Amino acid sequence: FSADMQTPKHEQSMTTDKVIDIDSLHLRYYGDNFLRHSDSGLWELFVKGDAFQRGEAIGKLSSDLLHYQEKVFVDQIREIVPSDSYLKFLRFFIVLFNRNLGENVLEEYRDEIYGISLSCTHEYDFIGTPYERQLNYHSAHDLGHAMQDYMLVGCSSFATWGTQSADSSLLIGRNFDFYVGDAFAENKQVAFYVPEQGYRFASVGWPGMIGVLSGMNETGLTVTINAAKSAVPTGSATPIS
C-alpha cells in the first residue's frame, strides 16, 4: 500500500553554483543564498528565489544538518517505540493516514520541500523516499495530536503591551514545546526568506522546516503556532504550520 504525495517533476538545476564553505567565518554560500553559524549558537539562513530554488538552496547549504535532524528524529521515535513490529504498524498507519497529504499541501510548498529533499540521505528509504519523508515530517506536529499521551506536542506563548511592557511596545514570546529529544533541539535556526512573490519574512525553527512555527513578515505581522488538545483526526489535511 502506498500514498500519492504528488511528487513535483522538477529536475535538479544545472547551475554551476557550488557551496562555498568559509570555515573561519562559519559561513556557507550557495549562489545568492547563505547559511551562517552565529556567535549566539543559532544557525542563520538566507534564501531567495522561487519555491524550488529556495528548497534546492536550503538542501545544498544544510545537507549535513538535514541528515542530523532526521537521524535524531528517527532515533527518538525508535526510543519511544522500541518494537520493530509496532514501528512497521506505525509506518503503515502514517502512510494510510497521510495517503492524501500531497493534495492538501500547496504546490509552492511541495516544490520547496522537493528541492530540499534532493540533498537528503537515502539511509532512511525504508520509511519512504526523501521527498515523502520530508513531506510527512512537516505533518509531525499534527500527528502529535493523535499521540497526545506521549506528550510530543504542547506549546505556550504570551503577548504584552501598553502599561504592561517596559516601553509600551508590543512584546511577544513563546515556548516551543515540540519535544523530540535534546539532540533535535541543538540546531536552532532563524531563516530569512525573500520569495519571488509575497512578503519577505523571518521564521524560527530547525534545518529543513519550511513552515512558520514562530515568524514575522516585513510588515510586522507575527505568527506563532500553539497546539492544543483536540479530537483525534481521521485523515490528513493541510499541516497547521
Question: Where would I find each of the regions flagged by the language model?
Answer:
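N-terminal mature-domain region immediately after signal-peptide cleavage
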Residues: 1-241
